[in-house]
Amino acid sequence: MPQNLRSQQGHSGLYTLEETAEMIRAGRLLIVAADGDVLTSLPEGTWLGGVCTRFQVGNGCVRSAEKAFVIDLTDVVQSHRLGLYPDFALESVYEDLPSNGFSFLLIPGFSEVHRYFGAQFAIRRKPTSSPLTGFVAGADVGEAYMQDPFVVDGIHGVVYRDSGVALHCKLGKSQRARIEVINPFSEGAAGDVITFESSALVLRECKVNGETRNFADYVREHAVPEGLPLVGRVRGMTLNVTLLFPLGRRSVTALSPVLPSVEYRFARRDEMGCQRYVDVARRATRRVVASMHGYGNYPMMAKEGNKERPFPGPFAFGEIAMLLMNQTTVNLIVEEVDDDEVQ
């Protein structure tokens, strides 16, 4: 193994195809985010993968179709097992969470699993002792080279476009996992109230302050900028919904399904700057196992150029923190616990 790989075992980072393949052949336990051609070129081994081409690295944001972002779990996890989840079996992912550990779930973007996870899990949230994290795969939406979203079970060498795959990871007795969410957005308190009658990823008709409107027309009329999410409160949590540009003629595609009866407003425009994210991130934990970032925040973060970034990770079509999140940073943290906390 090359010297630079030895020094970075157990860490996240951007690697070439050959470096990633070498880690797989060495038996490392990996989560891989990469271009579809890169993923399908990797050998079988103990890894899961999802399509992604935008990443936050130590000194900025990059798009790469040649390199893979690798999260190495080998030195963190005591044992692991694979789970496969088509839409009709998705709720069983909660039943499969380890008693002490975490689960890392990858979902193909715009699949029925994506819609179902975003819509139903927000409503049926269950208390668990171990966290569920991960991301929704997808890349380059709205561009000429947009990719077909899929996830990969690298253990068996199988590609899935309509099912989620998960690694259920068990920790040692003296360790505990938790997740934290960095959300730079809040509701614009003075904004219009927007509601939708059904759960959907493609948004057409809505009600604005009780009046029926075409949502795409409303977004254009109010010159809503790319990167400004809808924000709503769901069971006490603030959830963002990323809107994809360019808009359709009479529809808008979202990266998380809207929920019926939830009152949405657009986030405050002054929260779109990178400094707002930095201010919120300062309060977050620095020692993390993995970080996932919202795809809709990439333009905002990339504009800031080469500045130190505390949380390397992929920009995904959705971040998982028990529920489906948009335009946040989700951190997976594993900590040692005191002896009196160990049962």
Which residues does each PLM region occupy?
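Hydrophobic alpha/beta core scaffold segments
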Residues: 1-343
